[in-house]
Amino acid sequence: MAAAAGEARRVLVYGGRGALGSRCVQAFRARNWWVASIDVQENEEASANVVVKMTDSFTEQADQVTAEVGKLLGTEKVDAILCVAGGWAGGNAKSKSLFKNCDLMWKQSVWTSTISSHLATKHLKEGGLLTLAGARAALDGTPGMIGYGMAKAAVHQLCQSLAGKSSGLPPGAAAVALLPVTLDTPVNRKSMPEADFSSWTPLEFLVETFHDWITEKNRPSSGSLIQVVTTEGKTELTAASP
């Protein structure tokens, strides 16, 4: 079962060197939790690291990460696996970069989410939490960012599939996808300096949301697609209609 209230937790952060992943590592280490980062680069603040090897083969990458996480954890179980890996690339169906960007989005979102889901079947405690990184935009068509929309829609479908009884997740475990609009990250501020930052979601809000869900406070039901909408600096979570 998941740890009792007040106990130190054990968490895997897939994408632990990204903007949101780094904040998660910092915040949970500050609570004296054991936090492992899975990313293409080490996070020195993490308790442990699994460095992902870049490859064009999904099976190679999946096997490498699965094997190294298995060696790291042994028989130990974790309270949560937070998949916060991802990225963004635009382009419509006519774009010269369509194939390249679709490939990139698939690697950054679908590969990472699929590997995280498999890790959950092996290493997540009963009653544990798996979060996936969806996108509110992918609830509808995304003609200006075809690859991004397809990849995020696949993540949404994966999350809903994991809620099924025969999904392979441990008893009582929950898979939940967060569907933000725009996160307030340094990269986004640099690329969109004229944007309305009051409509962007602060990373700290998501970190605290993860903390609540890990400790089973206001945790949504498994399979939920949770929209994250920030308006005039106020962020609200609402479940997307099935």
UniProtKB/Swiss-Prot annotation:
Enzyme class: oxidoreductase
SUPFAM superfamilies reported in the protein's UniProt record: NAD(P)-binding Rossmann-fold domains (SSF51735)
GO molecular-function terms, A-Z: 6,7-dihydropteridine reductase activity; NADH binding; NADPH binding
Pfam families listed in its UniProt record: adh_short
Keywords carried by this UniProt record: NADP, Oxidoreductase, Tetrahydrobiopterin biosynthesis
Active-site residues per Swiss-Prot or TrEMBL entry: Y148 (proton acceptor)
GO BP annotation list: L-phenylalanine catabolic process; tetrahydrobiopterin biosynthetic process
Catalytic reaction equation(s): 5,6,7,8-tetrahydropteridine + NAD(+) = 6,7-dihydropteridine + NADH + H(+); 5,6,7,8-tetrahydropteridine + NADP(+) = 6,7-dihydropteridine + NADPH + H(+)
Binding site for NADP(+): 12-36
Residues with PTM N6-succinyllysine: K71, K77, K94, K100
UniProt-listed InterPro entries: NAD(P)-bd_dom_sf, Sc_DH/Rdtase_CS, SDR_fam
E.C. number(s) listed in UniProt: 1.5.1.34
Domain of life: Eukaryota
GO cellular component: cytoplasm
Function (record text): Catalyzes the conversion of quinonoid dihydrobiopterin into tetrahydrobiopterin.
Quaternary structure note: Homodimer.
Similarity annotation: Belongs to the short-chain dehydrogenases/reductases (SDR) family.
Protein's UniProt name: Dihydropteridine reductase
Protein species of origin: Bos taurus (Bovine)
